Amino acid sequence: MDPKHCEPSVATGPYRAPWWLPGGHLQTIYARGLARSYAVSYRRERWDTPDHDFIDLDWVDHASNGGRLIVLFHGLEGYSQSHYARSLMAKATEFGWRGVVPHFRGCSGEANRLLRSYHSGDSQEIDWILRRIKTKNPHSDIYAVGISIGGNMLLKWLGEQGASAARIVERAVAVSTPLDLVAAATELDFGIKRILYASYFLRTLRPRALAKVVAHDLAIDPRAIRASITFRQFDDLFTAPVHGFQNAADYWTRCSSKPWLDKIGVPTLVLNAQNDPFLPTSALPTADEVSSAVTLEFPRCGGHVGFVSGKFPGRLDCLPQRILRFFTMQLKSSNKTRVSS
């Protein structure tokens, strides 16, 4: 890996994308195709939830240092085989750490039992998962990572818990987080981004919603769900009412993690590329909007959970290396912001 193209710690230079992979769209889309480069062997475990549902967790157990455990919360429609999960778990294994990817409800390949699914602000689910992991691993140091909406849930939970989160997690990293859900959804619902991204996610979200409409006899018009082509339409029809929100705007406003950043009490890295197609730079927080425990890092490029590095065809080592370095380093200063020009 070319060190000029990857930032291994806060104190050194920012991430730079390879010359052969320009632009946020290419950096986002291309990274998905590199998942097969990382071989990971998981052990699946099923947990029953307090509300009589279930979630599946995929564990990486073969580690020399069982005292450190990374918990990775995946992004929208993600799972343990997503490119960022495989690359991070492979790198964690190299470091001798254990890892686990809890699947949000319905994301492990099997539909969950209840009407409810998962949503961008489901910090209660994060709370239950992390507390149970800590209870089952009382002698392990827990490090949490959230990707995209998994990062939004994690940051919201960290803010809600404040300093008490330190009883459960040592440190946290949120990557490519849609910190302002209103801004993110608005960004993705128009133009080329609607075609590239909203359509991609809705391709799987719509069938899942339709299955729940039938299974639970919901008073929702299936034709309207099939016809939804934006996040606003889909969240207005399904996500918001199913999870107790008035509409999409109410859901996005109440679930955004950005207002919680100034309440976080454990060392947390917020890493967002400035060319992330999912969030405009105007929605990124400033240093005075976050607590002293939060480090903001906004490299000029990287796309949405891209951060490819090296010569063609590239590698995904940069992001997991950055995450693990943050987890193992001593912060030299508080509330540090790094923005590349």
Where are each of the predicted segments found?
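Short beta-strand element of the alpha/beta-hydrolase
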Residues: 67-75
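Catalytic nucleophile-loop/oxyanion-hole region of alpha/beta-hydrolase
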Residues: 91, 107-143
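Short beta-strand/loop motif that positions the catalytic acidic residue
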Residues: 264, 270-272, 276
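Catalytic active-site module of serine/aspartate enzymes centered on a nucleophile-bearing elbow/loop
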Residues: 300-341
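The serine-hydrolase catalytic nucleophile loop
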Residues: 78-90, 281-283
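Alpha/beta-hydrolase-fold enzymes
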Residues: 2-7, 135-242
